[in-house]
């Protein structure tokens, strides 16, 4: 089977298109508890002291509200609010950094919100703060999310001078009517200029985000967006399924249900996306992601060493992830932790305690085993029973007897091939990888929570 081959089977896609987790973690965030306290955090930090460190910093501010957005953000044009936020971040960074004094940072990512909401002086202040408090590898990956409406070319130069070497840009759709209906109108020519300039000044990796399922999108209109994106030629592409949840996200109430594409249209758009991007030379990595065949994500997947965390797919698997800022999530040791998600409470707690720890979970042995199984399937589309048995001292067929029974109907439908040695996800199964992973999710079996997740397609 070709590494990027997907066998589009509409009947199977419709059969299995029910709600499920995205598995940026296992257990998922639904299992986080507010009983998780500082002592558990410190225990997690001490678990694997030899691991390199990946840093995530959340910048929640945006100048404008995008109606589709479900992120943790604060829409304001009052720039001084960013200074107040940086004051709190400084407290948190100075409180957390000594715990990782012997670690080296191999990865830093700024997400949001809109990280480029910060002006040049604020960007420099935060980078200086991070470099003063953490030990960065000379070849560290330093990435940032960019809104093309909220950046000038000289800011890109400033980011590069501050050490940023990777760029992710939210484009979503090139169609003007779609942009207007989601309150995200942008200059197409400037997007091309921005990406080309990023390459010219030494950004080594570029990513474009698209969203399908937005109001007034059609397979025909999105085909134009795909054509323009392949002309942009980024190293990576993320094509997300829009989840319309107006009861959860107030901004989405501005989107009329009648304007949304039908379920069949969304499937048509997805099929068109996969065909167009693979014909343009991109490899389907999984879930929503595509990459050039020579991109390190694609290479890692072919070698069976791709990983996944709260930030998506990564080649850096054996690292601890420390998240800082409001709502930021960490993956440290055998635990997951999340900061306060309301800004007022974040400020209050950082001021009182130096950190903003809100909730988390310490993984059990069973959690860790299932985490490894799900990660192998979702990242590399295959699972070696012997590798799991050797690492965890168990007999796979016995330990996962119930799970393999749940997987059996999916095997009969041709989504996976199960042998004595392992599981291989087929070309039909790649699009439905979440369904396959759900067979190994013990928490789903305990609770009827299916309605809390987005549909798999």
UniProtKB/Swiss-Prot annotation:
Catalytic reaction(s) noted: coproporphyrinogen III + 2 S-adenosyl-L-methionine = protoporphyrinogen IX + 2 5'-deoxyadenosine + 2 L-methionine + 2 CO2
Cofactor note: Binds 1 [4Fe-4S] cluster. The cluster is coordinated with 3 cysteines and an exchangeable S-adenosyl-L-methionine.
This protein's GO CC annotations: cytoplasm
Binding site for S-adenosyl-L-methionine 2: 68, 113-114, 172, 184, 209, 243
EC category: oxidoreductase
NCBIfam families: hemN
Full protein name: Oxygen-independent coproporphyrinogen III oxidase
Species whose genome carries this gene: Salmonella typhimurium (strain LT2 / SGSC1412 / ATCC 700720)
